[in-house]
Amino acid sequence: MGGRVFLAFCVWLTLLGAETQDSRDCARWCPENSSCVNATACRCNPGFSSSSEIFTSPTEICDDINECVPPSKVSCGKSSDCRNTEGSYDCVCNPGYELVSGAKTFKNESENTCQDVDECQQNPRLCKSYGTCVNTLGSFTCQCLPGFKFKPEDPKLCTDVNECTSGQNPCHSSTHCLNNVGSYQCRCRPGWQPIPGSPNGPNNTICEDVDECSSGLHQCDNSTVCFNTVGSYTCRCRPGWEPKHGIPNNQKDTVCKDMNFPTWTLPPGVHSQTLSQFFNKVQDLDRDFKTSSAKVTIQSILKELDELLEAPGDLETLPRFQQHCVATHLLDGLEDVLRGLSKNPSIGLLNFSYPAGTEFSLEVQKQVDRNVTLRQNQATMQLHWNLAQKSGDPGPSVVGLVSVPGMGKLLAEAPLVSEPENQVVRNETHQGLLPILLSDVISAFLSNNDTQNLSSPVTFIFSHRSVIPRRKVLCVFWEHGQNGCGHWATTGCSTMDTRDTSTICRCTHLSSFAVLMAPYDVQEEDPVLTVITYMGLSLSLLCLLLAALTFLLCKAIQNISTSLHLQLSLCLLLAHLLFLVAIDRTEHEVLCAIIASALHYLYLAAFTWMLLEALYLFLTARNLMVVNYSSINRFTKKLMFPVAYGVPAVTVAISAASRPHLYGTPSRCWLQPEKGFIWGFLGPVCAIFSVNLALLLVTLWILKNRLSSLNNEVSTLQNTRMLAFKATAQLFILGCTWCLGILQVGPAARVMAYLFTIINSLQGVFIFLVYCLLSQQVREQYRKWSKGFRKLRTESEMHTLSSSAKRDTPKPSTPGLLGLQS
């Protein structure tokens, strides 16, 4: 026994010594999460790993082993997840789950007791207002109550849905939607009520209009009549009544007053017993006026006006301008009175006529979409009904037309102010001439007062007296002036068609209208004649320029005859040129007068040279019988320049000094025909071409005798025949064809106008043809000039070629120093 104890004690001491030796030999460099095996080796702790189980390298480290990923075979079970820890791992329940025991972790699937957590029960306020919490496996959701939706910025906050604006309501069209918090209602609109058996509010509500007028629910004033409308009502003035000042008609608060007779009194400053009696009768009608008797009052006023204009009495003794003022006052007042008294819808359609010719047509209708035509014996008016409707006034529309032929007595000699395209009368142009009134004076009015710029034109068809041929017809209206009087005007009115006894007018405003006739013949321009004039004069200018150059440069033909030709050509050249470029420059009166006087002088000078040409031709023919050239030459040279340029200058000076304002017309820079002023040109012209024609006839008679006395020598015969041909051509050159201008009357006027324009616009062509192209001496000179020109051109070309050849020829080389040495 004792030996065994001793043996055990010895073994224990041996082991204790070995352990002490090992402890002293443990390696001190082992890394974190490891332990030493001996003095030279280490081993990683459980849950960590290195490159080998036991390692001896001091640089080795121990890494944590992730037991939650392969190849580890850790399984935590359903609704849980493995969570790695330092050197170990845990199993935890998924969010929204918890262990039955309440513990937070477990180690393996056998310990898994994870179950769903009901968040809605744990926190009833988890979802905000108007939201409901719904538990789900491992989580929860918030759902909005009906009529609400989530706000985009906060998925837990619900906000109201406006079913009325979003269109998410089935309300009937007879209701209107009212949004509530989380809901809506379908309520009847104001002025509507639920149909029998229908609720008022739910989405199946159906409503019908309430007739406030028949049910007595309206609040219309006693001066108005209730008119039911869909969902409401309006209050309109009673027939013959009108809204009080500042209060619109057809409103719920409309208040009306009985219709007043429009104010119509004697115009100030006019002293006439006849007119005073008329307005006394008008005042009597005003005093006894009742709305119900509006039709009778209209008839009475028109009857009194008809009698006044049939026998104006002392009105005709008033000065013309006062008569025009009275007419303006009568037309204005008549229009206002008739418009005011015609608003009674019970009137309907009226047509009155009176002994002196006054006619009245009226139509009163509710709003219609059609044209209306009012016909009278002497006038017809056509327009669309929408022109008569006053903006914002649902009442009846009025269209009226009154024809007052007697008004023409007061409007006699009234002035006309027309637009430029219709300008036929100008005080400075046609003094004392006034347009003639052809038709009756008519006045048109509508219930709409704004008739100065109508949306569509009104058409008037006038019957009138026969129009004098070639007189212009104008559609005019009476325009009121600032002084209380007025004048005829054409602005806004156009003449669409005119015949002998009828005219169609179209106007964009309403007033008093009539048809006027110009007091003198108005000639319309023929575009064909204009083209012929400008083409003929342009060709004549070219020929006159060539002829003048020929007479100046051709020395062989220069004599008294060519001097006459040259002066005639220059005068016509300047006159035609001024005519082409300045005849229409009427915008400046002074400039136009200067142009007209210059044309007057140049054409008179040209005709004077034509007279001298005819005289010289006559003397030449006479001297074929008796030779006396020297005396002729001295006589011609001494007189021709003073006569040709002096006489026209005196004539123009006298005309300009006596009536300078008659130079220039509204359309042309020429002499005006008034007071015989145009005869300052026509008189000398007629005298000259008459003398020229007589001289030419005598010349031809002399030549005929000369031809009969000649022998048959060919050269003499040919020269004399050429002289005869030239003498005949002088009919065109010497202005004898200007008589065609005087013959422009009657049926042949158009033919004469064309002949006059063609022949006289080509006068320069005849001069160049007869005096240049048919002259043998001139033709010979043309040939010489042509040969000289060709020779000059050839020499120029040869000189050019010679200069070019010299430049192209190589120059001989000059020997240098090396050449000299050799």
Curated annotation (Swiss-Prot):
Domain notes: The GPS region of the GAIN-B domain is necessary, but not sufficient for receptor cleavage, which require the entire extracellular stalk. Binding to chondroitin sulfate is mediated by the fourth EGF domain.
PANTHER family per the UniProt record, alphabetical: ADHESION G PROTEIN-COUPLED RECEPTOR E2 (PTHR12011:SF328), ADHESION G-PROTEIN COUPLED RECEPTOR (PTHR12011)
Function: Cell surface receptor that binds to the chondroitin sulfate moiety of glycosaminoglycan chains and promotes cell attachment. Promotes granulocyte chemotaxis, degranulation and adhesion. In macrophages, promotes the release of inflammatory cytokines, including IL8 and TNF. Signals probably through G-proteins.
Spans annotated as Disordered: 797-822
Species of origin: Macaca mulatta
Protein name, as recorded: Adhesion G protein-coupled receptor E2
Cytoplasmic compartment spans: 552-562, 611-637, 698-728, 775-822
Side of membrane Extracellular, spans: 19-530, 584-589, 659-676, 750-753
Mod. after translation: Autoproteolytically cleaved into 2 subunits, an extracellular alpha subunit and a seven-transmembrane beta subunit.
Quaternary data: Forms a heterodimer, consisting of a large extracellular region non-covalently linked to a seven-transmembrane moiety. Interacts with chondroitin sulfate; the interaction with chondroitin sulfate is calcium-dependent. Interacts with CD55.
Domain EGF-like: 22-63, 64-103, 116-159, 160-198, 209-247
GO molecular function annotation: calcium ion binding; chondroitin sulfate binding; G protein-coupled receptor activity
Carbohydrate attachment residues: 33, 38, 108, 203, 222, 351, 371, 427, 449, 453
CDD domains hit by this protein: EGF_CA (cd00054)
GO cellular component annotations of the record: leading edge membrane; plasma membrane; ruffle membrane
Covalent S-S links between cysteines: 26-36, 30-42, 44-62, 68-82, 76-91, 120-133, 127-142, 144-158, 164-177, 171-186, 213-226, 220-235, 475-505, 493-507
Any single Pfam family the record assigns to this protein: 7tm_2
PROSITE patterns: ASX_HYDROXYL (PS00010), EGF_3 (PS50026), EGF_CA (PS01187), G_PROTEIN_RECEP_F2_2 (PS00650), G_PROTEIN_RECEP_F2_4 (PS50261), GAIN_B (PS50221)
Ranges where the record places region GPS: 475-523
SUPFAM superfamilies: EGF/Laminin, Growth factor receptor domain
Region forming the signal peptide: 1-18
One BP term from GO: cell migration
